[in-house]
Amino acid sequence: MSKFRFTIKVLAIATFMFATVSIAQAQASRTWVSGVGDDVNPCSRTAPCKTWAGAISKTAACGEIDALDPGGFGAVTITKSITLDGTGTFASILASLVNGIVINAASTDVVTIRGISINGFCNGINGINILQAKTVNVEDCVIFRFNTGNGITVNETNDLNLNVRNTVIRDNTLDGINTVTSGAANKINVTLDNVRLSGNANGLHARSGSRVTAQNCVFSNNTTNGIFSDAAGANFSNVFVKDSQISLNGANGVRAGNAGNVGISGATINQNMIDRNTSNGVLVSTGGVVNTFTNNSIIGNGTDGCPGCTGVGPGN
């Protein structure tokens, strides 16, 4: 009997070790999705999966999921460091009645979304909804037609870095990018480079805890403000913009209020063009501060100039 029990224990240990090894082997560093794939596959290049969600469980933390060919690869929730890359294909997400991508990872995780078209189908919630991560990189993407939320939403309780580059965020019912942290001492650091925000309510809505730097961007044809910096309580919102176009918005090109702080700078030789906005080129609301260099062009707006602004830099 004791020999039988010993044999059973050995078999149980062997089974556990085999299962552990199998799970480890299933977590590949690089996996693949395809429009003709199947999520029962191992997500290898020769046997790809069908969806991001199907591949993510088979991809190790810090790994990468690549799109082999054009396809709609479905909404996905990300809970670890990972890269989704659709570069060179027409990789897309059709997010009807849901968020396109939800990021709820550890506060030490880095997530990269690259080369993906994210379509809200006129009833989606948010294009990318960021709840927690250390850093989120959005590169070479198009995010559009989310009618109950924002193109990119950040609602974070910890510090977070958001880097958006070479991306179009358009035609969303609420904001193109909306950032806020609920932690009084926390901050969201946002870098925008060559980002086009158009056809939203506010192109950029930087709320409490937001620290934004934007360059070579376009904030145009939004129904309210091109850029809106506002905050509540002691946690300020700061936006620094240079070498950008802020035009044809339904209310103001730039608005700062509710303890918001916007620094509109043309740096040394570059300019911001703030023109043809319906109400004001620049509006300083209660509690707001706008610092402006002299090399911004503020013309053709309902109200031009920069009343209430503080001049900084050369020539002031």
Please identify what each model-predicted range represents.
Residues 60, 73-85, 92-135, 148-157:
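Extracellular beta-strand-rich solenoid/capping regions of secreted or surface-exposed proteins
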Residues 2-12:
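Bacterial N-terminal signal peptides that target proteins for export
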Residues 21-26:
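Sec/Tat signal peptide C-region and signal peptidase I cleavage site
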Residues 88, 109-120, 134-146, 159-174, ...:
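Right-handed parallel beta-helix
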Residues 10-20:
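Bacterial N-terminal signal peptides
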Residues 35-74:
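Acidic Gly/Asp/Thr-rich repetitive segments characteristic of extracellular carbohydrate-active
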Residues 95-104, 121-130, 146-156, 171-186, ...:
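Extracellular beta-strand/beta-solenoid scaffold signature
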Residues 67, 78, 86, 103-105, ...:
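Extracellular beta-strand solenoids
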